[in-house]
UniProtKB/Swiss-Prot annotation:
Family of this protein: Belongs to the UPF0213 family.
InterPro entries for this protein: GIY-YIG_endonuc (IPR000305), GIY-YIG_endonuc_sf (IPR035901), UPF0213_domain (IPR050190), UPF0213_GIY-YIG_endonuc (IPR022992)
Protein name (database record): UPF0213 protein YhbQ
Species the sequence originates in: Salmonella typhimurium (strain LT2 / SGSC1412 / ATCC 700720)
Disulfide cysteine pairs (residue numbers): none
Pfam families assigned to the protein according to its UniProt record, in alphabetical order: GIY-YIG (PF01541)
Biological classification of the source: Bacteria, Pseudomonadati, Pseudomonadota, Gammaproteobacteria, Enterobacterales
HAMAP family named among the record's database cross-references: UPF0213
Alphabetical list of PANTHER family matching this protein: UPF0213 PROTEIN YHBQ (PTHR34477:SF1)
Location of the GIY-YIG domain: 2-77
Length: 100
């Protein structure tokens, strides 16, 4: 199973873009050369603010969705406090019990 990563890229105007990939370095290069997400094109200098392995694609999609719902302040906290990210990741890894 190929591991998936979540990453946050900071734009020149200090915005944070959230994405997932199996290869952070490759995806970051794509964004820098204008071959990544349209949302980052023309945004000036890009810096990789955060990256972490999150598991399989399903979990990566769930955490990406959850992070995209956060406020800018909450996203900044994930970048600066690893424990905040680990807590969020852990909350999404908890199995959901289904009633039969």
């Amino acid at each position: 199973m190929t591991p998936w990563y979540l990453y946050l890229i900071r734009t020149a105007d200090n915005a944070l873009y959230t994405g997932i990939t199996t290869d952070v370095a490759r995806r970051y290069r794509q964004h820098q050369t204008g071959k990544g997400a349209k949302a980052l094109r023309g945004k000036g200098e890009l810096t990789l603010a955060f990256a972490a392995q999150v598991g399989d694609r399903s979990l990566a999609l769930r955490i990406e969705y959850r992070i995209k719902q956060l406020t800018k302040r909450q996203k900044e906290r994930l970048v600066t406090e690893r424990e905040a990210f680990e807590a969020l990741l852990s909350s999404l890894q908890t199995p959901v019990l289904k009633n039969d």
